[in-house]
From Swiss-Prot:
The gene is hutI. The lineage of its organism: Bacteria, Pseudomonadati, Pseudomonadota, Betaproteobacteria, Burkholderiales. Its main location: cytoplasm. Belongs to the metallo-dependent hydrolases superfamily. HutI family. This is Imidazolonepropionase. It comes from Paraburkholderia phymatum (strain DSM 17167 / CIP 108236 / LMG 21445 / STM815) (Burkholderia phymatum). 4-imidazolone-5-propanoate binds at residues 76, 139, 172, 240, 317.
Amino acid sequence: MKQTVWNHLKLCPQGDPAQTIDDAAIAVENGRIVWLGAVRELPAQYAAWPREDLGGAWVTPGLVDCHTHLVYGGQRADEFAQRLAGVSYEEIAKQGGGIVSTVRATRAADEASLFAQSAARLEAMLAEGVTAIEIKSGYGLDLQSERKMLRVARQLGERYPVKVYTTFLGAHALPPEFASRADDYIDEVCEGMLPALADEGLVDAVDVFCERIGFSLEQSERVFNAAARHGLPVKMHAEQLSNAGGTALAARYGALSADHLEFLDEAGVAAMKEAGTVAVLLPGAYYFIRETQLPPVELLRRYGVPIAISTDSNPGTSPATSLPLMMNMATTLFRMTVPEVLRGVTCHAAQALGKADTHGTLAVGRAADFAVWSVQSLAELAYWIGRPLCERVVRGGETVHLRHAR
């Protein structure tokens, strides 16, 4: 039985800078919080427990990265350079680039190689305070390769101190072998891939890219119905490049989240509010593709729709691994406030995964998953650009990352 009191810390237990405790303590037993509050109020029963003094550092819940494509083969830096030189995305795609190049690299990689590439990205996220993450498939686009991606995601969760939730995104793009046969491919997604992967226990949720360059409303609904048959929650890449009406469909199916949302309208916002669907904003992708259409943050505020922030870590449109950087981008590009972005990477991000009861806040009975920050103010988490701020990451009461480890 391991018992520890983490003391002399500034505590932000709910991801809300308005609700903090100065000179706080957290009592942890067997990986779970049994008490938290001001040091001066520490109950006598914990007084003799071993102490870890954090020297007045800020402590927040472990960060939650709720939308990533972390597992993939290769990278697309050369295409990035081509775009900067004036080559269009369409021209790159005709040359065999774009998402097809990532599909090709992912299909070619064996599990060990895919694991090694993805582990490096996960290690970078852990070092910046992440204790829970969602990882999507969607760069395999056939049963064997989608299975491989999801198996690697599961292995990452088993071998690293980060909780991994998997999402099947077979309906991400049309693979070359199904060119001009989108309906046939959706048949394969719904009747071939999803049943097999769900039966193997590799899928926690199902996603679809509903967009003019992705899949139609009717095709997206077929994927959602297939997910329902397997008892799996759904989410959607929606309204990123146009207002295709995907958000209303996602809300009708009680989606955990709708993500991107640059072209979301008020009707879609109202539908999300009624359904309890979280808005996941992805400032890295907005920045990287030089989008100019801002997501309707003010409408989301007005309707009280929870807003999460995520890296969208992927090789094509957001090669990012830093949630604090996304916090900065969300404040500067999307005009969000510090409290909004802090909630966006903690409690609201957990809600976007359907895991608000286990992640994103610190409370008695919860796992002791938290990040320790070398800052004077929580605003610094969104203020500094490229500066390492996370001193320590604790998962289940154990230190799993220490920036100045000796």
